[in-house]
Every structure is written in structure tokens, then in C-alpha cells.
């Protein structure tokens, strides 16, 4: 499959997809940050969780590959340090006690490079506390989207490799190979309610699947998005509300 870089609409993210960081609040509890710690928020998005962490620790830094997201984060939370950086190849001058990452690492298809980057950024005994899409995450939506693209002759777009959704076994093995000790790992089913009861799936595709539409006509984009929503309705529309079929991984691991 072809690898691509996704572009982000920070305003749409905040307006209709705030569930991304709302669900991440419980991950901060798993992080259990201490007042004397230096924390790195990897894939911080528009910075809401980074800001929450900032009041609990000595120092926090937010990194994200998207300049649009970092600009939004800096505007909303000027007291917090945010920088543009790629999770697959970032470097730090001073080691961190922990790396926190919510709903970001499935966007990094160079996952081995990301694991190596996290390892070098931690002090000995430091930990990662991460959550992201696991095996079969949004399978219903992505299968329907690829099928609609193929049907209209957009075979190249349908083959795009946009995400990394590993099993628990695959990801924890990669962490151990890199030198981490895995102390907690969980895969779970988390159907996620979408904001708009009329255009929930269309909005989700606009936010998270727009990279599939490079080279697709505007007319076809509209038709495909609506078609996908119609296809998945029997499975993902319940009691008058739209849900995305999220499957999540949570992992805590320490640098030995």
C-alpha cells in the first residue's frame, strides 16, 4: 500500500471530534504524573491534554507533526511549550520521565522508528503510557470507503496505507525488541458516539479520511462519503445516533 501524510483541520477537530481528547482524560489517570516529572505529550493535537498535564508536573512539552494543530495549541495554551515534530524521528536534548500519547500513534506507519524515538527520549526507568487504534479499528468504515473508491476506479486511493492498527501481541513484541519492559497491555472495544446525528460518518471521513481523496473529484467525494454512511448504517447507527467502530490499545512500558 502507498504511504501518505494526512493534513489536519484543527477547527473541525475541535468542533466535531472533541471526543478524541475527552476520552484521553482517563489515560492521564493511568499516567499518574508526579509533580517533579518531565512529561512529553507525543501527538498532542490541539493541546488540551497537554494543558491538563501541565498543572500536575514540573514540565510538559507537546509535539505534533501537524503545523496546524501546533498553531492551534499555542494559541489556546500560550503557557505550554509546543513544537512541530515527527513521532518517527524526533530528538530531545534532555530526557523525559514519561511519554504520554493519546490517539496518535496509529497515524505513524513507521512504527518501529517511533518506538526507537520514544526509547531514546526517555531516561532509564522512564515509561510510555499510550493509547491508539488497535487491530480492526474502524474496520467497518474503512472497508466501506475502500470499496466505494474501487467501484469508481480510484484504485490508487483505495490502496493508501494511512494507519497502523496492530494487535496487542505485535505491538508489545516490538516494544520488547526495542528494550522496553511491558507492564500493562489492553485491547478493548470502544464504540464512539459521533456529534452529528445526521452526518456523523460523513464528518468523520472529512476529518480523518480526507487523505483518501487526493485526486478524487469534489462531486465523487460527496457521493462516496454519503454512500459510505449509507453502507455502514445497519451496523453503526443505533438509537438515532452514529457511532464509529473504534478498537483501542492501551500500553504501559518502561525503559530498562
Model feature map: region roles:
Residues 112-127:
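A short glycine-rich, Lys/Arg-flanked "PGG" loop and its adjoining helix->strand segment in the class I
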Residues 98-112:
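A short SAM/SAH-binding and catalytic strip from SAM-dependent methyltransferases
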Residues 163-178:
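Short alpha-helix
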Residues 1-37, 48-52, 72, 76, 127-154:
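Conserved class I S-adenosyl-L-methionine
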Residues 183-239:
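C-terminal helical/coil "lid" or tail adjacent to the Rossmann-like core of SAM-dependent
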Residues 88-99:
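A short acidic, Gly/Pro-enriched loop at the edge of an enzyme's catalytic core
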Residues 40-42, 46-90:
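Class I SAM-dependent methyltransferase SAM/SAH-binding core
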